[in-house]
Amino acid sequence: MRSKKIRNIPPYNIDSIFNALVLGVKDYVTKNNFTKVVIGISGGIDSALVSAISKVALGGKNIYGFALPSEYNSDESLKLAKNLSDNLGFKLGELSIKKIFNENISLLYSTLFKDLKWDIAEENLQSRIRSNLLMAISNKFNYLLLSTGNKSEMSVGYSTIYGDLSGGPVSYTHLTLPTNGTV
């Protein structure tokens, strides 16, 4: 039996990939009877990429970004979120989750978590609070919440069910993002 020749696979064509992602978002949003989207904006690469794809797919006026900082977010994250919204031309709202998070922590530690140490449960709680608020905004204004989770995070379990995985899938979740911040 002859062995088959292994074919060379050409390098990624970034423009083609980006255009496919734009088409995927536009198609998903319109087929689900939405015209606008809401995106949680962290100041990081994931929300920036989803925002850029959405800007081309839907236009900046159809994006409502939200920064939802806690006491653990830096001022730099908020500055990056604001720069992103200014550069892409979408509205950015800000809702601090500090009070809600602290109330949840107080309740849990006064009862169930008494004498337990801080771990991933508290970290995931922040993501889930953000998700609840974003879903409320989505429902109230009839905007589709877009997820900012990606394949790299999902493959290693670094994502939160009912947290950053909430929302309509953006087709870029099938990509593995480079760790050097280039997209």
Describe each PLM feature range.
Residues 1-38, 56:
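RNA-binding accessory domains that recognize and position tRNA/RNA substrates
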Residues 6, 65-68, 114-122, 164-172:
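Short beta-alpha connecting loops at secondary-structure transitions
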Residues 26-35, 56, 60-63, 103, ...:
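Conserved helix-loop functional segments at active or binding sites
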Residues 35-41, 45-82:
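ATP-dependent adenylation/pyrophosphate-handling site
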Residues 62-67, 73-121, 127:
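A conserved beta-strand->alpha-helix junction
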Residues 134:
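Glycine/Thr-rich phosphate-binding loops that ligate phosphate moieties of nucleotide
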Residues 173-179:
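Conserved small/polar residues in nucleotide/adenosyl-binding loops
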